């Protein structure tokens, strides 16, 4: 049986090369053709990257480590740096903001207003190695996920979440520790890759 597809393709390596993503095939970089990326020049790609359909990336600096997955319908926005460490994941419809308007009413809001009339907060967002962000979660400017931190679905991250914790809620709070078994799996994967190269 033939599988019929509509808008199910990732950009070709030639298309990625034209956007300035060098050696995309050997680095295993996949960007879906329906993703909206405002400026490819502001993205640093590691290896083994996958950006799924209908994701919108409109941020000043995006740093993606190795083995990073940005799932369907995610949004990454802002003028401060957003960085995702090795083996980090943001699940479907997750949102990351490195900039936010002032909601107090003391200034005007939105990008149609000249900057002199707004009071936008810009703060770097750092997602450490082995972090997992659950579906429909939101990270606000200045959020820091230390290594191994996991965020449950539909949570709101404000500030720092400790390493190897599982946090949930609005705002997200740690509820228990997370196992570190994935560190052993990372070493096994590294050895497996070396064996493949022999």
Which ranges hold each PLM region?
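Beta-rich strand-turn-strand
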Residues: 125-126, 136-149, 155-159
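Conserved beta-strand-loop-alpha-helix hinge in the C-terminal portion
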Residues: 164-167, 171-188
């Amino acid at each position: 049986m033939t599988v019929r597809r509509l808008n199910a393709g990732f950009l070709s390596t030639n298309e990625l090369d034209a956007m300035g993503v060098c050696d995309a095939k050997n680095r295993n970089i996949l960007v879906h053709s329906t993703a909206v990326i405002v400026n490819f020049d502001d993205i640093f790609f590691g290896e083994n990257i996958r950006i799924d359909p209908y994701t919108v990336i409109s941020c000043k600096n995006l740093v993606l480590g190795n083995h990073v997955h940005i799932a369907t319908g995610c949004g990454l926005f802002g003028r401060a740096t957003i960085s995702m460490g090795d083996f980090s994941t943001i699940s479907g419809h997750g949102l990351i903001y490195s900039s936010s308007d002032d909601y107090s009413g003391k200034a005007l809001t939105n990008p149609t207003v000249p900057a002199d009339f707004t009071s936008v907060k810009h703060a770097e967002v750092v997602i450490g190695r082995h972090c997992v962000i659950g579906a429909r979660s939101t990270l606000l400017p200045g959020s820091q996920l230390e290594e191994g931190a996991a965020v449950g679905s539909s949570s709101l991250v404000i500030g720092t979440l400790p390493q190897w914790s599982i946090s949930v809620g609005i705002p997200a709070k740690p509820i228990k520790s997370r196992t570190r078994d994935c560190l052993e799996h990372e070493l096994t994967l590294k050895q497996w890759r070396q064996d493949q190269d022999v």
